[in-house]
């Protein structure tokens, strides 16, 4: 028994074809939107690729770009099919291809849904990518004279200013690395010598942060150095003082930015997916309604359209059976090829 059977007369078939034609061209515009979102995300990721781990993947933006292009192609073709469906002579040339085309549309909808899920699930991989990338970026902050790394200081400073953040997880991350280049250290100074000798790795570590960590909204002049030394500053207690530095770490700030971006893109892609599913269902009804016309010479006659020719369970069983037959035929062909090679070897 057919699933979700609907009766169509000529007027209903024409309205369905016209409605699907309009929806397909709207979906072409939606495909352009998805393509644009993927391109925008790719550009945003590349802009900050210097503070991301090298293993950072562009799978999601690339997938959005591909899905956007495919959406434009498939829906343009579907729009042409719906337009020609109004003319029996023109529809005849599409008739043999419509069923395979619907199967491709189902696969496209599955792929689009998976890409939508990836948009919402990207946060986990992005978090580890940012953690490693920012850590390495801060490590190279001082290498202003090293080719290939001389830009890192500007990159980190601009990042901290733009996103109002400091360090990887917080401002104390700067205490654990030497962010001042040896070029600007006076090695004849006793303080510099003592600091380097007191460190196992021979690094010059200070309880200070770069200028880009300063919050300009603070009424107090920025305290960059000796942040943990209360006596170095008037009326200051680092444990209770609300520091005039950015409180948030850059990993959390970037993660929040990209997560909101990905959630918005995921929501848009989900709406487009629902729209595409609706179009595919409509195409299925149009296909079965036109196939069910008993007398092609009488376009006014009624016909029946359905979503599935059989029930869900019967359709699933038939699908599994077809897979088994396909597997057996491949196995027989492989055995035949092996048998043909054996006499040649003899």
UniProtKB/Swiss-Prot annotation:
It is found in: Membrane; Cell projection, Cilium, Photoreceptor outer segment; Photoreceptor inner segment. One of its GO terms (biological process) is protein localization to plasma membrane. GO terms for molecular function: protein homodimerization activity. Retina (photoreceptor). In rim region of ROS (rod outer segment) disks. Residues 1-24, 81-99, 291-346 are cytoplasmic. Residues 341-346 are annotated as: Interaction with MREG. Belongs to the PRPH2/ROM1 family. Essential for retina photoreceptor outer segment disk morphogenesis, may also play a role with ROM1 in the maintenance of outer segment disk structure. Required for the maintenance of retinal outer nuclear layer thickness. Required for the correct development and organization of the photoreceptor inner segment. Homodimer; disulfide-linked. Forms a homotetramer. Forms a heterotetramer with ROM1. Homotetramer and heterotetramer core complexes go on to form higher order complexes by formation of intermolecular disulfide bonds. Interacts with MREG. Interacts with STX3. Interacts with SNAP25. PANTHER family: PERIPHERIN-2, TETRASPANIN. This is Peripherin-2. It comes from Canis lupus familiaris (Dog). The gene is PRPH2.
């Amino acid at each position: 028994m057919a699933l979700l059977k609907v009766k169509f007369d000529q007027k209903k078939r024409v309205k369905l074809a016209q409605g699907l034609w309009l929806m397909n061209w709207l979906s072409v515009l939606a495909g352009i939107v998805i393509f644009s979102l993927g391109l925008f995300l790719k550009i945003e990721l590349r802009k900050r690729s210097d503070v991301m781990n090298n293993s950072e993947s562009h799978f999601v933006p690339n997938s959005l770009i591909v899905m956007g292009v495919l959406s434009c192609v498939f829906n343009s073709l579907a729009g042409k099919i719906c337009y020609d469906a109004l003319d029996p002579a023109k529809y005849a040339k599409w008739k043999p291809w419509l069923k395979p085309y619907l199967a491709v549309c189902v696969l496209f909808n599955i792929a689009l849904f998976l890409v939508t899920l990836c948009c919402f699930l990207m946060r986990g991989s992005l978090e580890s990518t940012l953690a490693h990338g920012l850590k390495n970026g801060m490590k190279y902050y001082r290498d202003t004279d090293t080719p290939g790394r001389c830009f890192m200081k500007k990159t980190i400073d601009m990042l901290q200013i733009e996103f109002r953040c400091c360090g990887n997880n917080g401002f104390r991350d700067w205490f654990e690395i030497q962010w001042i280049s040896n070029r600007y250290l006076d090695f004849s100074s006793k303080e510099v010598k003592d600091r380097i000798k007191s460190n196992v790795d021979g690094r010059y570590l200070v309880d200070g942060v770069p200028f880009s960590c300063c919050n300009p909204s603070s009424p107090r002049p920025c305290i960059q150095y000796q942040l943990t030394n209360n006596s170095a500053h008037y009326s200051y207690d680092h444990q209770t003082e609300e520091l005039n530095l950015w409180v948030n770490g850059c990993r959390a700030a970037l993660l929040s930015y990209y997560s909101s971006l990905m959630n918005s893109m995921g929501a848009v892609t989900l709406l487009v997916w629902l729209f595409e599913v609706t179009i595919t269902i409509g195409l299925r009804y149009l296909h079965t309604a036109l196939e069910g016309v008993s007398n092609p010479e009488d376009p006014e006659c009624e016909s029946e359209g359905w979503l599935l020719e059989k029930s869900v369970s019967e359709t699933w069983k038939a699908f599994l059976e077809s897979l088994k037959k396909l597997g057996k035929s491949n196995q027989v062909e492989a055995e035949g090829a092996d048998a043909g090679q054996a006499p040649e070897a003899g």
